[in-house]
Amino acid sequence: MAFQLALDALSSTTHRDSISAPLLDSSVSQLQSSLELFPYTVPKELVPQLNRMGIQVSGLTSTPHPHAAHKTLELNLLFNHWAKSCNVDSAVVFMKPSKFFKLQEKNSHFKSLHNYRLHPHDSNRYPHPSTSLPTEKRFYIHDSLMYFTPHQISGLFESCPNLLSLYASLVVPPESSMTDLSLNPDLYRYSIHKSTLHYTPEGHSAGSYNQPVNALDWLKISAIQTPSLSLSVSVLESWGPLHSLLIERSSQTQNPDSQKIKDLISFQTPQALILPNPDSLAVPLRHRLVPQKTYDALFTYTRATRTLRTSDPAGFVRTQSNKPEFNWVTSQAWDNLQTYALLTASYRPPVSYTLHRSPLTKLKELLTRNALKLAAMASPALTLAIFTTMTALNTNSSKALSFSALKIHLLNPLTGPELLHFQTSVLQQKNSAPLSQAEAKQELDKSAVPAPSEHDSSASQSTSLSLSASSQLLSTEKHPGSELSSKAIPVSTSCPSASKQLAPPLTAESHSSVNALLRKFLGPNSPQSNLDNYNLHLHPESFTLGWKRRPLLLDSHSSFLPSSCLQPPASPSIAAAPHPLPPAQKPPRPPTTVPTPKPLASPSQTQAAQPATQSPPSIPQTAPVTSLLPAPLETDDSCAGPISTFQDLFPASYYPHTANFPCRSKIPGYLEAPYPPLDCMLVALSAQMPQSPQELWSALNTLMPLSALTSPSLRVLGLGTEELTALSYYYHFQAEIHSDNEIYRFGIQTASTKLCLIRDSGPPAHFTAPDPLRAGSPPSRSQTNENSLRRSLLGFRLNGNLLPIDQVHSFTSEPSRAKNLASNMKNGFDGILTTLAALSSLSSGPSPRDRIFTLDGICDFALPKTVDLIHLSGFAGCGKTHPIQQLLKTPHFHNFRVVTPTTNLRSEWKSDMALPAHHNWRFSTWESALLKHAEILVIDEIYKLPRGYLDLSLIADPTVKLVILLGDPLQGEYHSTSAHSSNLRLSSEIPRLLPFIDYYCYWSYRVPKCVAKLFSLPCFNPSEGFIKTTLDFFPSANNLVNSHSVVHISEACGWNAVTISSSQGCTFSDPAFIHLDRNTALLSPSNCLVALTRSRSGVYFKGDFTFLSSLSGSSRMFSLAYSGQPIHLPDFFPEIVFQLNMITAPLTKRSSSFRSGFQPNISSAPKIPAPPNLPCPPHIPTNYSKDVIVNNQALYGESLERRLSVLHLPPTRMTLHSDINITAPSSSSFQPSDEPVPSDHTAVYPGFDFFTLAAHFLPAHDPEVKEIELKDQTSQQFPWLNLDFHISCQTSSLISARHQPGSDSTLLPASLHKRLRFRPTAAPYQITPSDSFLGNCLYRSWCQVYRRDPNVRLPFNEALFLECIAVNDYAQLSSKTQATIVANASRSDPDWRHTFVKIFAKSQHKVNDGSIFGPWKACQTLALMHDYVILTLGPVKKYQRLFDQLERPSHIYYHAGNTPHDLRRWCSKHLETSHCTTNDYTAFDQSQHGEAVVFEVLKMRRLSIPENLISLHVHLKTNVETQFGPLTCMRLTGEPGTYDDNTDYNLAVLNLQYDLRKTPTLVSGDDSYLSGTLSPRSNWPFVKELLHLRLKPSSLIDGLFCGYYLGPQGCIRNPLALFAKLMIAEDDGSAFDKLPSYLTEFSIGHGLGDSLWQLLPSDLVLYQSACFDYFCRKATRSQKILLQPGLVDQETLDKIALSAKFISRPFYSMLSSHARSLISTKFKLDSSLTTLQDPMVEFELLPFSNVQ
């Protein structure tokens, strides 16, 4: 600690480097050795675990490995543990030769290597098998002990007489003795299948292996004894699942004292405890194991909160269950924990504390406690009868315990240390001989129980003595873990003579035994028993995993190896191989391919004599990809009952499969959904029915759930066939839909009424009524012939499967997109056709260059063209091309042409189609295809073509009738090679073509199984495949590179290479070689996906392997693929995947469900979930209290308890509230001022008509000129259409910009660049030396103004801080309505990171001098923070504010918490002149950087705020993230203490610029007013350059502060702004509601009398008079009291406020606390009023007397 203090003291001095040099020197060597020994990248969450195990892992390595932590454990075992213990010549068994030679280089005592092929996989791992056993005195068996039994190991010692000791590594989870769920799932997982344990290291399924489940027996035996051999078994070390064992021949002489020490062993487990079993139920121990910290915190929480609801324990558990350190806890355990806490919350210790008890009281307690004992002694007959019964029950047992020992148990049944002493005394009588072989088998299975603590009664129960029947009757209820007691060792066998000791006659001891028995059955228990039972259940001991090891006695031994392994091989070539390997021999040269490192213990490397059967890994079947969004039908409040189908709820004879959609019963009389904007179906039906569209909609509301009638699909796409089916049931009709020359039938089959709807596919699709002349007849034959291609497409089948489309869409071209591409081609920026002008001399027609120029001219006058279009899309290799190729071979589709992006893909089409040579013109690359014509246009890999190519193709070929698109939106897009091309400026084709993708085929015939497993992809390729690295370069291989420059270099060297982007669409039979270089990190996820999915056989990575390290700067997708981890497509393509309707099997039938909007309803019917067991009410009122189980009132304090209801709080937020009552009364209360009235007469006004001035106030102008455009959208800050006005030529709302985020979609995006400052990366903001220097300057300047010593630190006042916590809770509960808090329940969601802030725009119409007649203005951004931040740091700011209010000099004025009257009084007292200096800032909040954080930290440390709160504040400020990106540590409106920190920062900056120690100064946020004309300090120019602020000071006579003109006479509201507000209110009709607030503001200056004219500039006299004229005309008699001379009493102000519907900030500040409380519950407060309320609440509630 002393060294740390020295480091902290010298860290900011010139001695920093000198004192830290020794630390650096000692760390360098350790770091270097760690990097060399452990080179693999261990997951960051496992690094602390390995460090706690004593393994020096740095976490700075970069070599990837699929299970790096296990590899690190193995390296530590070999090169640290074994290498240091090997001090004699030793042999190593079962190890790769390469690994052995590395170990031999580390320690030369490792002399020989012996491997034996016991499994087919061993032939690959062990190239030189041994044929004999080693001869050394010490063996090292590497990761194979779990495959050998004690019989075989004893046989090894018998076969090797020279063998003295054997070191062996064992991989087995210790907790497998009690559960099949891992206690460390980050490190390993396992499952148990009968006698096999399947082990998976670090989630790497490919590295999982099987081993015998009884391998755990090695950790339970302490010795192996045979008739001729004695071996001791020692567990040297345990590193999680890896254990190092030493088996050696026992010494002839042993210390006799060692036999008295129990051989107990324990293992490292999470800090946990075991919950008790429920009454009469048995829950597995694994599901009762919970974190100890969570249990202790929940135990305290349920007893500390005053109002505990049934949901609060579950809410508390939720705040803990998502923590990564608790991922070992099962969901059942969390459920049991919250249930247990809920049901035991009311239990309290059965104790009492009474002082000065009299002897008589003690005697009464003694008699009461021993009443049954006295009764038993008084009735010998009863005693004899009971004891005779107990003796008779024991006669069936041949062996029993002595009564003298049993009486202790009867007197104190299973309580206290006495029982443990009793059981220990009995256990000492047991023979300590080793277990026999049969007993050992049973014993090893029974001994694996959680190790008890010394004084745990449950521990003694876990040994479970087999007592007599009487003792069993006296046993208490089961304790956690007691279900294991039936498996423990019987001890009664150790007392052969116990039955003879039951003969003594009855004595007083027997009376005591009967007393205990009667108490057990009749009750009550003794007070001590009750207390012990309470502690046993509610304070259980910590969980410890361990057991007692026992010796094992064997009758015989088995051979260590099969006889076949020790026979010389028959082959001469193999027999010639040396055996064993000599130490000097080097391993053969390794292959050039870099092998994937092996797991810590795999079956292939550690198979033994009888290995467990190894089954090859198989890829699990993947479920179909379903929607990630839950259906809202489950939570629909308008329904009742479970989810069912419409056909089940409303039975009728519907057409098949038309009424199977999910539905619920509608509650009668529920609110009706608003009429839909897209009502073409209702209009079409109404034309054929007597009902109007509104009546049809009302009928739907009686049947359909509200969620279905307000769904986004219905609002955006219109009504569909589900609504048509519901109407058919209501009105009993059947309907026919004629769509794309097909007829679909819906409704009631037996209905006599038949309706017809004509559906136009669009876009947008549309329902219409049939032409009356046709009378609903189907389309004519001529129309059917014209659409024969559509019918053929929809009916085409290949191998019984349909094309993956749902309909034939209509596509309309955009000539502007075609013109862009044609211009770029003409100028040579895209394509090469313009370079082919020389070919014109070889042909009679125009050259390609001329034809492109002609096409460019045609685009200038081209009109949009509509054609039929289908889009086949799917994963790489899903078979999009093959069905289209078969379709084109049919007669209907013979007139086609195919467009491909590359020549390679064109060649594949030619070979697959196998057409005659004269048809080769039908296959073209994208440029030459523009010069050809055909009715059917097929475009393969559409997204690899330039943007606008589809539009240009339709203009170039007017004969096209049908377009077939093939492509995958997840793969790469086209990118021009010319920097001058403007094609990139067009919008992407992906969002444009996504609506035409009906289905996305999510399977593959191409990729091998190992690649398909990464994407959870159904795979039809039988090849397993591989993903490896290689150091070789094969010139003729399929080399995929990142850039064209590498391609050119490769071609110059004669090597085959193609860019990853160019390979899209190609299929390789041979492996794909992916080249890694610095451009790999720049690859998009689309290109990475292309590279991984080209080959049928596998993937090789070559080049720079650091890009596979999963670190910053590497390729994430490549890293995941190489490590075998799953690749989730939504993580890489979130904007695309969620819009795709994925299918995982070929389409065999199509849905006939339609909607009138753009897309049909193509999704399959969702699965209907089972009805819930306990349905909750649809709405829970905020005052619902029936779920409250504990409601404690304050025991002391004021008569009126200052507590607000917390019943409406979300359970996750309830845990954040302290629920501390404010008990200390405030020593300061608000008293009305006794100062004289400002003026006893009313001012004389030069009368001026308000409406006359208002008529000419607003200049005539075009408001649209002030608007801005953002992404083709116009802002809406000056709306004027359909707005009423009557006092001027335009609506008065045009006076200033209005911010309405709901109606202005450009408001927030256009304001971001001005209101927010972003960090360049996601890394935290780093405090610079300049920030530290400037922050100290600001702090000293601020202390100078307050006349404080900056070096003084005040002691922390804990009692006062508790009061601040209570006030903060009170303010958070009272500042918002209960409904608002419920609606924002997500703010306390534990899944919301507390460093994440949601930014949204503030809705306001700000009217002041700066905004009147101003231009477009950026909105104010508000930050929505987590409740944890507000409730944790809020008390800190209130604590600081309290000290600042008390110590603030009188000449410094902070406006927060003060009323306009307070401002007037302060001005009258301190201001001597109207001359002033004001200041304005540019981007005040955004310009506060690291220096503001340093300043805030120094302010908190001055008051000794706890360091954990300071660290939290710094962490939040430097790590803020938003939905738009990471922010700098700027000031955010919404963070705790925004106003205080802004005001302090402003004051500190002003004092750096001017000397304010004696200058009257008013500050409020970024606003300031300095009395007089001041001169800057001499050092101000230097300090100014360090600040990021841009100041705009000005000296003038009439200065504004917070909207008021100030002077020695007082203050007056700016009449210009007030006049503008009155105009706006008069025009929009809200003047009646707002008049009380505006009148109150006006009365502040009006009360000054004639002196008010001295404060106003002369040009504002007319506006003051006009305002007075308006109030005289419009104010009521009661409101005009405010205009009378003198001060208005508080009661009158409160009455006026409570009757108003609008409260302004100044008016709100003058109200009483009672009125403010009523107003806050009456309607939602504005955020400005919320911030104003905090200091007022503190003024009334905080005990100022506590401050010393």
Curated annotation (Swiss-Prot):
Q: Where is the composition biased (Low complexity)?
A: 458-475, 601-616
Query: According to its UniProt record, which residues of this chain constitute the active site?
Result: 680, 766
InterPro entries xref list: (+)RNA_virus_helicase_core_dom, Alphavirus-like_MT_dom, DNA/RNA_pol_sf, P-loop_NTPase, Peptidase_C21, RNA-dep_RNA_pol_alsuvir, RNA-dir_pol_PSvirus, Salyut_dom
UniProt: ATP binding residues: 874-881
A matching Pfam family: RdRP_2
- One GO molecular-function entry: mRNA methyltransferase activity
- Domain named Alphavirus-like MT: which ranges? 58-219
Q: Mind telling me how this protein is modified after translation?
A: Specific enzymatic cleavages by the host yield mature proteins.
Q: Name one GO biological process term.
A: RNA processing
Q: Which UniProt keywords apply?
A: ATP-binding, Host-virus interaction, Hydrolase, Methyltransferase, Modulation of host ubiquitin pathway by viral deubiquitinase, Modulation of host ubiquitin pathway by virus, Multifunctional enzyme, Nucleotide-binding, Nucleotidyltransferase, Protease, RNA-directed RNA polymerase, Thiol protease, Transferase, Viral RNA replication
Residue ranges for the region (Disordered) are 433-507, 569-633, 767-786
Task: List residues of the RdRp catalytic domain.
Answer: 1474-1580
Q: What is its EC number?
A: 2.1.1.-, 3.4.22.-, 3.6.4.-, 2.7.7.48
PROSITE patterns per the record? ALPHAVIRUS_MT (PS51743), PEPTIDASE_C21 (PS51738), PSRV_HELICASE (PS51657), RDRP_SSRNA_POS (PS50507)
Q: Where is the (+)RNA virus helicase ATP-binding domain?
A: 844-1001
Q: Which SUPFAM superfamilies does the entry link to?
A: DNA/RNA polymerases, P-loop containing nucleoside triphosphate hydrolases
- Which part of the chain is the (+)RNA virus helicase C-terminal domain? 1002-1138
Question: At which residues is there a site annotated Cleavage?
Answer: 775-776, 1156-1157
| Peptidase C21 domain residues | 627-781
Similarity-based family: Belongs to the Tymoviridae non-structural replication polyprotein family.
Protein name in UniProt: Non-structural replication polyprotein
Q: Which organism is it from?
A: Erysimum latent virus (ELV)
- Source taxonomy lineage? Viruses, Riboviria, Orthornavirae, Kitrinoviricota, Alsuviricetes
